[in-house]
Swiss-Prot record:
GO biological process, one term: regulation of DNA-templated transcription
Cited SMART domains: PHD
ZnF locations on chain (PHD-type): 209-261
Function in brief: Histone-binding component that specifically recognizes H3 tails trimethylated on 'Lys-4' (H3K4me3), which mark transcription start sites of virtually all active genes.
Domain notes from UniProt: The PHD-type zinc finger mediates the binding to H3K4me3.
Major location (coarse): nucleus
Top-level taxon of origin: Eukaryota
Protein name per the record: PHD finger protein ALFIN-LIKE 9
Species: Oryza sativa subsp. japonica (Rice)
Subunit structure: Interacts with H3K4me3 and to a lesser extent with H3K4me2.
Annotated Low complexity bias: 145-160
Length: 278
């Protein structure tokens, strides 16, 4: 009914949206008695219109077919006396929200908004409470959701920060306890074996460098390593086919050499998975 007004930019369409929205909110809140009175069920199909100048109007639908602009819900007056007033106003509010979006994106389609324009327009619209939220009193829940969003971002940021030190640790934290438990379970004889084989690993650490027992490469800050509970040598997880998740379930880890495999082929105590010799 105001087809002569045609916004052409994202900002103009959003300004048009806000004006129409303000008029509809006023009809359903501050001017609700007047709006209720005008929606006489005895009249013909009536629609609630909002205009860019923040005014509203209850009127018959446009006569031209198809209409220049999308039309709001038709016949809102018929349900007025058959519902609780609060429920009826909520129903009109929901239909009004849908109409506002259809008008805004009608302009977007007509004037060739691209993907980024449409995304920006929707973001600007979505920052406002819906008419239904205002009428039903749920718009007060909007600010907390924004806070929750920022909190979730800070939490995810904290998780990222806290994960960085763990990635830079020279040796994975869960492994030393696993090694100690394995030695206690094995008892004295295994301790003697571990003591004999661990001398080399200790000398490597004394010199400030840990070498992989499989490939001979030095430790990398972003790599997962695992220690053999028998010979106390460290290995790249990828070299012995052990992942951090799999290591969580291993009570005692034996490298391929200490596992007694055929020709040096390795095994893991507890799950029988074979590791490829390097």
């Amino acid at each position: 009914m105001d087809a002569q007004y045609n916004p052409r930019t994202v900002e103009e369409v959003f300004r048009d949206f806000k004006g129409r929205r303000a008029g509809l909110v006023r009809a359903l809140t501050a001017d609700v008695e007047d709006f209720f009175r005008q929606c006489d069920p005895e009249k013909e199909n009536l629609c609630l219109y909002g205009f860019p100048n923040e005014h509203w109007e209850v009127n018959l639908p446009a006569e031209e077919v198809p209409p220049e602009l999308p039309e709001p819900a038709l016949g809102i007056n018929f349900a007025r006396d058959g519902m609780q007033e609060k429920d009826w106003l909520s129903m009109v509010a929901v239909h009004s929200d849908a109409w506002l979006l259809s008008v805004a994106f009608y302009f977007g389609a007509r004037f060739g908004f691209d993907k980024n324009d449409r995304k920006r327009l929707f973001g600007m619209i979505n920052d406002l409470p819906t008419i239904f939220e205002v009428v039903s009193g749920k718009s007060k829940a909007k600010p907390p959701s924004a806070n929750n969003h920022s909190n979730s971002k800070s939490k995810s940021s904290n998780k990222t920060k806290s994960s960085e030190p763990r990635a830079k640790q020279p040796k994975p934290q869960p492994q030393p306890p696993v090694k100690n438990e394995g030695r206690e379970e094995e008892g004295g004889p295994d301790d003697e074996e571990g003591g004999g084989g661990g001398g080399g690993g200790g000398r490597e650490e004394e010199h400030g460098e840990t070498l992989c027992g499989a490939c001979g490469e030095s430790y990398g800050a972003d790599e997962f390593w695992i220690c053999c509970d028998i010979c106390e040598k460290w290995f790249h997880g990828k070299c012995v086919k052990i992942t951090p998740a799999k290591a969580e379930h291993i009570k005692q880890y034996k490298c391929p050499s200490c596992s007694g495999g055929n020709g040096g082929g390795g095994g893991v105590s507890g799950n029988g998975k074979r590791a490829r010799p390097s």
